[in-house]
Regions:
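N-terminal localization/anchoring segments of enzymes in phospholipid and broader phosphate metabolism
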Residues: 1-82, 105-106, 120, 161, ...
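Short, flexible loop segments at the rims of nucleotide/cofactor-binding pockets, characterized by
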Residues: 59-65, 89-92, 141-142
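Conserved beta-strand termini and adjacent loop/short-helix elements that scaffold enzyme active sites
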Residues: 62-63, 115-117, 143-146
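Short beta->alpha linker loops
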Residues: 66-67, 91, 147, 186
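Primarily the HKD phosphodiesterase
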Residues: 69-136
Length: 202
């Protein structure tokens, strides 16, 4: 098991602070925080030689200095495109909603299937509205709101078939989380099948 991040505690970016800034300052700080988290993950992947090769995996844990969105961004930056993505999460941050939307708009993310918890609407109506409003009108995006607590996503560029599973949602978690990064086509197809089946339900 590799320690993904081993920074001193005073360098950990806390993501649950109550900010007293105007909205523009809040967004600016959130973007900076996310950029730092992305750099943390990129540095670790560089040390490991990039994503796992075919039929290999990395078992890693974090101390709260990165998240699923950082893994997704690393793929965007290192692959020519993501041809397919199958994503299941219980919740998601506004920054990561924006990442997905921008990736679809730019053409870097060709097809997205997303399964998310039916509790989101009641628990956080504003976040629910942001998620659905950002993605529902794209023809190459399928959304399914259902009773789910799954936390996994699978992406492919047509050559590699990466699945990321673990304890973390697509939110910014300032705590220890565990991840498995597996490059396995059969596992990719497994997640593709069950998420596609759910999104095809009325």
């Amino acid at each position: 098991m590799n320690d993904l991040f081993s920074f001193p505690k005073n360098e950990v970016i806390k993501t649950n602070e109550k900010l007293g800034f105007k909205k523009s300052k809040t967004i600016e700080k959130a973007n900076l925080r996310q950029s730092i988290r992305d750099c943390n993950f990129e540095a670790t992947m560089n040390d490991l030689g990039g994503f796992p090769k075919s039929n290999q995996y990395f078992a890693i844990k974090t101390n709260g200095t990165s998240d699923c969105g950082s893994i997704f961004t690393y793929a965007l930056n290192n692959w020519e495109e993501i041809t397919e993505m199958y994503l299941a999460t219980w919740t998601i941050s506004k920054q990561n909603i924006s990442r997905l939307k921008l990736a679809v708009e730019s053409g870097k993310l060709k097809n997205l299937t997303m399964v998310f918890s039916s509790t989101l609407k009641g628990a956080n109506p504003a976040l629910y509205a942001s998620l659905v409003g950002a993605l529902k009108n794209f023809k190459n995006v399928k959304l399914k709101e259902i009773n789910s607590h799954a936390k996994t996503f699978s992406i492919s560029n047509g050559i590699d078939f990466l699945t990321v599973s673990g304890s973390a949602n697509w939110s910014e978690n300032p705590r220890i989380e565990n991840f498995l990064l597996l490059n396995d086509k059969d596992l990719f197809e497994h997640h593709k099948d069950w998420m596609s089946e759910l999104t095809d339900l009325v």
